[in-house]
Amino acid sequence: MSKFNRMHLIVLDSVGIGAAPDANNFVNAGVPDGASDTLGHISKTVGLNVPNMAKLGLGNIPREQPLKTVPAESNPTGYATKLEEVSLGKDTMTGHWEIMGLNITEPFDTFWNGFPEEILTQIEEFSGRKVIREANKPYSGTAVIDDFGPRQMETGELIIYTSADPVLQIAAHEDIIPVEELYRICEFARSITLERPALLGRIIARPYVGEPGNFTRTSNRRDLAISPFAPTVLDKLNEAGIDTYSVGKISDIFNGEGINHDMGHNKSNNHGVDNLIKAMTSEDFKHGFSFTNLVDFDALYGHRRNPQGYRDCLHEFDERLPEIIAAMKEDDLLMITADHGNDPTYAGTDHTREYIPFLAYSPSFKCSGLIPVGHFADISATIADNFGVEKAMIGESFLDKLV
């Protein structure tokens, strides 16, 4: 019998808690990540008021300098620690795959200066359409169509852009480039980005509609991912007949592998919390695991180096936390963590190599406090231990510490 009948894992995308020991091996605009500290710098520069996460023990997590505006609790209601990444990467897929038990020794490729001419030329030859070279760089998905949508409507050229993650995105106005044609072009792009020098995690079709100054992305988005290179704990749970719920982009990150209930994409963090609560309160979800990603911290504020917006986004989540806890059953376990850092006060616009926080709470807890500093994959090992399935490649369970 499982110690916890249901386990719920929430990834606060990019909410790091201080530079990892190997952070200087990773850079942002030529600056090593060694001084990065997402939560620490937000707390120090613009203040951070997250009383509900503080109650769980966020301010108790060991650091050289305590979080300036997040107090330590003398009697927290949960367990807390920080976790270190062993994989060679600081992107979304690497972080999530390691959380589910994989060690990524070959990082995906990212393209801060845009995709090489060879890739663009192959796509042009296949599609019969030119590529707008000026868009070929890391770009906000809404800004890129605002900037180049009018030109695409006139010329029929492709808008190809990337981000901090290993992705190639193609935006196309549905009246100019039909959705099915866009999908075919993306499938070709997927076929030429499966190995170095362009090993990409996802190809994303980004259809949109509207007129210049009023473009809107549609629900016809399609993600062409690659599956994890080895079974994750999600696969182990699924094979054992245990329910696995995905909220947000989790299913995309794992290419649907190991997911048997997908709650769909989130329109916002708040929408993601709504979807999580919908899953938690479903009569069908009696036993199993839910896995949620809330991406607004990263996508809207981390990459854009907006500490005030990032802080407000954290406040917004913290205000919803009591609702999540209220949806828990007595023998549920809630876990809150991250997948990498993205310090909004740091150089550049890329992710930062950081420890991630880990908070755990159950109404059944008799004790609370700190658990030893571990690694990302310890989360999946703990989940596997709880449900009596085999763990994946790496990770050590701390299930016995949660009492």
Curated annotation (Swiss-Prot):
This is Phosphopentomutase. Isomerase that catalyzes the conversion of deoxy-ribose 1-phosphate (dRib-1-P) and ribose 1-phosphate (Rib-1-P) to deoxy-ribose 5-phosphate (dRib-5-P) and ribose 5-phosphate (Rib-5-P), respectively. Its cofactor is Mn(2+). It is an enzyme of class 5 (isomerase). The keyword Coiled coil does not apply. Belongs to the phosphopentomutase family. GO terms for molecular function: magnesium ion binding; manganese ion binding; phosphopentomutase activity. It comes from Streptococcus thermophilus (strain ATCC BAA-250 / LMG 18311). The lineage of its organism: Bacteria, Bacillati, Bacillota, Bacilli, Lactobacillales. PANTHER family: PHOSPHOPENTOMUTASE.
